């Protein structure tokens, strides 16, 4: 794993009280976020999660306590200087409509006085990193991009000056569910490379479980209800409030803690149009993991399933004979999302593909079910079953 380039962020009894308010918006929040981890702030409306995040870059000034980045109090720097050293991604992206994509990405380096050659090199590097080839995207304008593409530019812009800390305020909340899952997976893949310290705000507990190395659950009045890893929170909710907020299906939510890459993938019987039917029948009958062949194109991208009925007789396989719609998932897809996708498939199998949609292997509903039934170790060091109860010793 790459070395973390993030910084330790610590809240020390951080408080925000607005004039005339009966209670503080954030009440003596204390927690420490290790360098290179994603900490998700989650809770109901009015719990102070966004306020807590904005106190880090002082878009909202704290009225008590301290917030430090690698031991340095955020109040010790001028606010503008502080913000230029912290990445910031918001739900509506906030790109300048009259700037090109390259200019939007390079805003902070430009403010920091970088020369043009260095800015161009950095923007091209980041656009490539977020999956937007610079030759194709750098001279476009925001209105020429899809919502998902604009959000990728927002992430690239936040990384432009290589900040140790990134703040993300419901960054994927404004896109449709399919694009949202893709963006989540892409960001997790990116985080494995850049290892920033990320403070991520969401109201969605499922997103918190998927994205967070640690989760801070806040309740109304800005009170910290629990701060721990997703696995520990699901195994041992600290209070009735946390248990209600996480929901009754804690066992199913545990599937969000594991990803497709954590499973042993099945080996597909990959075929191309024009291959001999008899040879494919032989391969399917020779100890294959599955009863279906997977038709792929010349780039090894899935086109559909071929079953025994399609293989009757002799001669070459016709691409039109394949049953289209083989569901695809990525290695970063959570097992919960994968299960939801696979349950809509008549063959109960999903095709695992890379970022270029090339086949890596297959995942089955049965394999996900086995993972769901397996006990997990909670914060108390004991194994817990799918309902959070202490599992019997084997």
Functional labels for PLM-detected ranges:
Residues 73-87, 111:
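ABC ATPase NBD coupling module
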Residues 57:
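Helix-to-loop junction immediately C-terminal to a conserved catalytic motif
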Residues 269-291, 295-297, 315, 327-356, ...:
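The conserved cystathionine-beta-synthase
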Residues 102-110, 120, 124:
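Short helical segment in ABC ATPase nucleotide-binding domains corresponding to the A-loop/adjacent helical element
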Residues 117-136:
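Conserved ABC ATPase "signature" region
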Residues 162:
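Conserved catalytic motifs of ABC-family nucleotide-binding domains
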Residues 140-145, 149:
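Conserved ABC ATPase signature
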């Amino acid at each position: 794993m790459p070395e973390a380039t993030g910084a330790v962020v610590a809240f020390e009894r951080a408080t925000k009280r607005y004039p005339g308010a009966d209670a503080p918006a954030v009440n003596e929040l204390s927690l420490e976020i290790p360098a290179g981890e994603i900490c998700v702030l989650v809770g109901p409306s009015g719990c102070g999660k966004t306020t807590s995040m904005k106190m880090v870059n002082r878009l909202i000034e704290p009225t008590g306590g301290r917030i430090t980045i690698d031991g340095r109090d955020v109040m010790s720097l001028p606010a503008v200087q502080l913000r230029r050293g912290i990445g910031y991604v918001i739900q509506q992206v906030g790109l300048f409509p009259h700037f090109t994509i390259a200019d939007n990405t390079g805003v902070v380096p430009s403010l920091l006085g970088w020369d043009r050659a260095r800015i161009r090199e950095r923007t091209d590097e980041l656009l490539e990193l977020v999956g937007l080839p610079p030759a194709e995207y750098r001279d476009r304008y925001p209105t020429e991009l899809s919502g998902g593409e604009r959000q990728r530019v927002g992430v690239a812009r936040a990384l432009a000056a290589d900040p140790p800390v990134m703040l993300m305020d419901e960054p994927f909340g404004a896109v449709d569910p399919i694009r949202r899952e893709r963006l989540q997976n892409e960001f997790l893949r990116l985080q494995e490379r850049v290892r920033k310290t990320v403070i991520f705000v969401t109201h969605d507990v499922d997103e918190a479980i998927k994205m967070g190395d640690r989760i801070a659950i806040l309740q109304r009045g800005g009170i910290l209800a629990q701060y721990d890893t997703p696995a520990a929170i699901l195994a041992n909710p600290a209070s009735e409030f946390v248990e209600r907020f996480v929901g009754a299906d804690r066992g199913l939510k545990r599937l969000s803690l594991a990803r497709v890459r954590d499973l042993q993938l099945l080996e597909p019987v990959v075929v191309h149009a024009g291959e001999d039917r008899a040879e494919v029948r032989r391969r399917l009958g020779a100890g294959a993991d599955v009863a279906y062949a997977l038709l792929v194109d010349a780039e090894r991208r899935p086109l559909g399933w071929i079953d025994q009925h399609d293989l009757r007789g002799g001669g070459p396989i016709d691409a039109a004979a394949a049953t289209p719609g083989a569901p695809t998932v990525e290695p970063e897809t959570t097992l919960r999302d994968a299960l939801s996708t696979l349950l809509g498939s008549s063959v109960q199998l999903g095709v695992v593909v890379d970022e270029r949609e090339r086949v890596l292997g297959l995942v089955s509903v049965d394999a996900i079910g086995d993972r769901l039934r397996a006990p997990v170790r909670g914060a108390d060091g004991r194994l817990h079953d799918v309902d959070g109860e202490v599992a019997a010793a084997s």
